[in-house]
């Protein structure tokens, strides 16, 4: 018998009990933490799950003398690692008094998404999550010679072949695991820089876009753990003439998707332009290294938009222009952005902010 036989042990004929993996965001605001508990039987709704707690002093989220942080279950996904009726549970974190802790960005986002004006607009998001795979012991991109560089960019985007595409096994495993989990993953592709990949989630409505991105990140990190490679969401992992990593956020409201929507899109983009500093400061750490005006980005200090322009802050697709309705893409969020913050801020600026 091998270890993997035991890991893959099917419990369904033996016990009703299930395992729930509680997932939360740690003290850096980007690190994911998790722990598992046994429950008496299958669960279909987060409201059926017990709250739990953890030692916040060990995650940089509470002092040692008052270390308890409370987990509130918010969203359930099927567990692709344990399979069966086992589940992954996305949680957010609160003080014992019931206050959201500072790294809990979901709480404020949920308030925006439950506002009647936002609910009426049925906000859709499609998020393009880029990431880079690194060799474990040297923290250098997968497929790159140790301490050296591959040939210049050009052959790698959406490429095939052992000399161009590095880490596809991780990418494929992640794609299927997300589909199994019930995440609305809509595609994958190899990126411009070798060792860099992208997956897309959406269209997802409101707060669920944030839940799905966070759980997709968790699943990816678990897969890289097994594969022995390191995952980074750094927006510019390699200095120089190499593309950075972003999380382009595609967005539409009900009004934008209906006839005459293009005019609403233009007004929404205008509103985004008026809140440039607020959005940039919320769009990810280290983004100034990526938003230089080169490598398919707009300069961080200016706001621009255009049809089919990948050098603009906001891009409108040709189809949207032609049909007079559709969606737009905010190209500024970095790969390490918090999707709760970005999605709710876009909704707040475009729907709740009166001109």
From Swiss-Prot:
PROSITE patterns linked to this entry: GLNA_1 (PS00180), GLNA_ATP (PS00181), GS_BETA_GRASP (PS51986), GS_CATALYTIC (PS51987)
Membrane-crossing segments per the record: none
GO function term, MF aspect, one: ATP binding
Main subcellular location: cytoplasm
Top-rank taxon: Eukaryota
Enzyme Commission code: 6.3.1.2
Enzyme class: ligase
Subcellular localization(s) per the UniProt record: Cytoplasm
Protein name: Glutamine synthetase nodule isozyme
Organism per entry: Pisum sativum (Garden pea)
Gene: GS1
